[in-house]
C-alpha cells in the first residue's frame, strides 16, 4: 500500500485559494478519492489500489500538480510505501 502526505503553507493557501481556505482540503480529499485514495488523518491519504503499485501515486501527483492553488501553496509532499497500517484508535478510546 502507498500513501501520500502533504503540508500546505496557510499564508500561500489564503492568497491562492481564498477564504474559506480550509475548503481546499475538502477539494483535495474529493479529487484524491476519485482516483482511489482514502483519507486517513490530517493530510495523509492511502491508496486503495489492490495492485499496490506506484502508478496510482503518479496519478495523484499529476492531478495535484495541475491544481494551480495547490502547487503554489504546497510546502512539502511525500509518497511512501506503508508496510503495515495498524489502527489503535479503539484501544486508546476504551482504555
From Swiss-Prot:
It is an enzyme of class 3 (hydrolase). Keywords: Hydrolase, Nuclease, Plasmid, Virulence. Its EC number is 3.1.-.-. GO terms for molecular function: nuclease activity; RNA binding. Belongs to the VapD ribonuclease family. Cleaves ssRNA, mostly between U:A. Homodimer. This is Endoribonuclease VapD homolog. It comes from Aggregatibacter actinomycetemcomitans.
Amino acid at each position: 500500500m502507498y500513501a501520500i502526505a502533504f503540508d500546505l503553507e496557510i499564508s500561500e493557501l489564503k492568497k491562492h485559494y481564498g477564504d474559506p481556505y480550509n475548503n481546499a482540503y475538502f477539494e483535495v480529499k474529493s479529487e484524491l478519492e476519485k482516483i482511489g485514495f482514502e483519507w486517513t488523518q490530517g493530510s495523509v491519504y492511502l491508496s486503495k489500489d489492490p495492485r499496490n503499485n506506484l502508478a496510482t501515486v503518479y496519478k495523484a501527483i499529476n492531478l495535484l500538480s495541475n491544481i494551480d492553488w495547490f502547487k503554489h501553496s504546497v510546502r512539502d509532499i511525500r509518497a511512501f510505501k506503508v508496510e503495515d497500517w495498524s489502527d489503535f484508535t479503539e484501544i486508546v478510546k476504551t482504555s
